Design a protein with these regions (language model features):
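N-terminal Rossmann NAD(P)H-binding glycine-rich loop of SDR-like oxidoreductase domains
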Residues: 18-37
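SDR active-site strand-loop-helix element
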Residues: 22, 47, 83-84, 121-127, ...
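Adenosine-cofactor binding site in Rossmann-like domains, unifying the SAM/SAH pocket
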Residues: 44-63
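NAD(P)H-binding glycine-rich loop region in Rossmannoid oxidoreductase-like domains
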Residues: 57-102, 113-115
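Catalytic helix-loop patch of NAD(P)-dependent Rossmann-fold dehydrogenases
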Residues: 94, 101, 105-109, 116, ...
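NAD(P)-dependent short-chain dehydrogenase/reductase
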Residues: 160-208, 212-213, 219-220
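Mid/C-terminal beta-alpha module of Rossmann-like enzyme folds, strongest
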Residues: 217, 224-276, 315-319
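Conserved C-terminal active-site "lid" loop/helix of NAD(P)H-dependent oxidoreductases
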Residues: 245-251, 268-307, 315-316
Length: 319
């Protein structure tokens, strides 16, 4: 079961939060906004990039200052959860300046604004900061070694956030899918409607992570961070439990769609070359998350089942 701060405290009340979510129209940001809206006692502002450009230091500072004042007026504990990112892995290779602006300059400006405004920051990062050639799940303190522009800029963004001196926690995740935006689940549903058979790589291993579960995990962490407990800075990993290949994940998606999983065939990465190398193994360890007193996310298979049960229409291809 996905944990909440309430569960972590044995059923005690959660801190009433004021949460600013840059990147609020994306996969994770949309889920954060929905959960906080449903809680009703919290204040949430989840602007998209058109409303809040984190790459503009003045825009970031104004947004943080205004939200901090709104939190004070409502007598809520403020926290920023940054989900804004340049996530187009292949496009980043030909647009390194764009990736640098969003993944490095943006988080740096946001972190400096949070530092000066006295607001804690949770910054979402990625498994791509690692080389992707491990034989065991990556721990937060393991050596990084990104092999793509996307991964390099995300790692530089992490460092900029931590070096700002803000109260900041980095949360790395992987293989995210959800009802909003483009993702692997939606791609498989679209291709299933267009082709009799598909070939999907079976030599890349990771942990599929439902955006709604990740959002709940981030909010569980936001509770003590906003309350001022725990260390000033930390790096954690948060994904749904377990691991699989893209091939097996695709088969599971077909099953949820009510289709024959045998329509999906395995292939190697060499059979399906991409412009940018993908990690062969990028499973992230939950040990540090658990040691921080947080509830590990449920197995990826259970999350996928609920994603289809609650948001299935968003994943099914139309037309």
């Amino acid at each position: 079961v996905v944990g909440t701060a309430e569960a972590a405290r044995g059923g005690g009340p959660m801190t009433r939060l004021a949460v600013l979510v840059p990147g609020g129209k994306g996969q994770v940001g949309s889920e954060l906004a929905a959960i906080l809206d449903a809680r009703r006692e919290d204040l949430v502002h989840a602007p998209g990039s058109a409303e809040l450009d984190i790459t503009d230091p003045e825009s970031a500072r104004d947004a943080v200052e205004a939200f901090a004042q709104a939190a004070r007026d409502a007598e809520l504990r403020p926290v920023v959860i940054n989900t804004a990112a340049y996530t187009a892995v292949d496009a980043a290779e030909s647009d390194p300046e764009g990736a640098q602006r969003v993944n490095v300059a943006g988080p740096a400006a946001l972190a400096e604004a949070c530092r000066d405004g006295g607001m804690p920051l949770l910054h979402v990062s990625t498994d791509y900061v690692f080389p992707g050639d491990a034989d065991r799940p990556y721990e937060p303190g393991d050596d990084t070694g990104p092999r793509t522009v996307y991964g390099r800029t995300k790692l530089e963004g992490e460092r900029a956030v931590l070096e700002s001196g803000a109260r900041a926690w980095i949360v790395r995740t992987a293989w995210v899918y959800g009802a909003h935006g483009g993702n692997f689940v939606k791609t498989m549903a679209r291709l299933a409607a267009q082709r009799d058979e598909l070939s999907v790589v079976d030599d890349q291993i990771g942990s599929p992570t439902w955006a709604a579960d990740l959002a709940r995990g981030l909010l569980e962490l936001a509770d003590p961070v906003a309350a001022g407990t725990g260390p000033q800075q930390r790096v954690l990993h948060c994904t749904n439990a377990g691991s699989t290949s893209w091939f097996e994940f695709a088969r599971a998606i077909f099953a949820e769609l009510g289709l024959d999983p045998n329509r999906v065939n395995p292939c190697t990465s060499a059979d399906y070359p991409t412009r940018t190398p993908r990690p062969a193994y990028s499973v992230l360890s939950e040990n540090a998350w658990r040691e921080a007193g947080l509830t590990p996310l449920r197995p990826w298979q259970d999350a996928l089942g609920e994603a289809f049960a609650t948001s299935g229409g968003a994943f099914r291809h139309r037309g």
